[in-house]
C-alpha cells in the first residue's frame, strides 16, 4: 500500500474557480489548490523555492514537482485555449482561514468556526 500524501499547507483559496478563453472551450485543465499556491508563492510573491516549500510544509523537491506541473498545465491552457478550473488537492489552510467550502479534494479545516469537522457541512457554498 502506498504511503499517504502529506497534507500541504496553503495560505490562499482563490475566489474564482474557473477561467476560460473568450470563446468558451469544452476542454478543461484542472489545477489543484496546492498548484495554485505554488504559483502564488513562486511567481506572484517571488519567494524562493526553499522559502515557498517551507511555507507549504513540503520538501523543496516536492515543491519543484508541484510548480512544474502547474506551469505546464497553465501553458497548455493558454496556448491551446482551454478552460482552467481550480479544484481539489490534498491541503490544509493556514490557521484562521476556512477551506470547508471545497467540494472535492482532501481538504482539512483549521479553526473553522462554522464547521464541526464534517467534510460535507458547507458543500452548497461553493467557491
Swiss-Prot record:
InterPro entries (UniProt xref): UPF0251 (IPR002852)
Entry's family note: Belongs to the UPF0251 family.
Pfam families registered for this protein in UniProt: DUF134
Coiled-coil segments on the chain, per record: none
Name of the featured protein: UPF0251 protein Ccel_0627
